[in-house]
């Protein structure tokens, strides 16, 4: 059973200061079988992981005061020191060209904005199943295409 799961109810931690992202993620994932919690600052993510023990952390790349990439790196560093349990991380990117940053911070998957419920659910389901997820985009154009994630 994954770390934060109680009776197979996944816990998802969302790190964003944008209300519209909370609304999209909440509408896509929160239901009787999934709990979604939010922090507004990257600096609060490690403490929230300690308290909630989430199955998945979703991080907005442009979260204020500590960017999403730095937040993901802090998670991986804390995991490496056994300070927190290993947690799946999904990055929400502003541009397709930021995929290389996801690979550098060792995130498990990514989505490129604008978001939609189907892609959010598909990515979350993959990461909750222990898989990686790459948004099917073309780096040159930002349009949908097959792009393999090398995470």
Q: For the regions a protein language model found, what residue spans apply to each?
A:
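Two-component/phosphorelay signaling modules centered on CheY-like receiver
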Residues: 16-40
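Two-component signal transduction core modules
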Residues: 57, 110-111
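Conserved phosphotransfer microenvironments
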Residues: 55, 59-77
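Alpha4 helix (beta4-alpha4-beta5 surface) of REC/receiver domains from two-component response regulators
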Residues: 70, 91-109
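CheY-like receiver
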Residues: 131-151
């Amino acid at each position: 059973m994954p770390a934060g799961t109680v009776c197979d109810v996944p816990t998802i931690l969302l790190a964003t200061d944008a209300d519209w992202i909370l609304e999209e993620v909440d509408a896509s994932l929160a239901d009787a079988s999934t709990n979604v919690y939010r922090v507004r600052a990257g600096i609060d993510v490690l403490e929230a992981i300690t308290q909630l023990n989430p199955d998945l952390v979703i991080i907005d790349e442009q979260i204020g005061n500590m960017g999403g990439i730095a937040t993901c790196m802090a998670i991986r560093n804390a995991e490496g020191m056994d300070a927190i349990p290993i947690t799946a991380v999904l990055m929400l990117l502003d541009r397709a060209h930021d995929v290389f940053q996801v690979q550098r911070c060792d995130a498990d998957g990514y989505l490129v904005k604008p978001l939609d419920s189907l892609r959010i659910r598909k990515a979350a389901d993959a990461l909750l199943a222990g898989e990686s997820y790459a948004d099917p985009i073309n780096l040159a154009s930002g349009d949908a295409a097959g792009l393999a994630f090398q995470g």
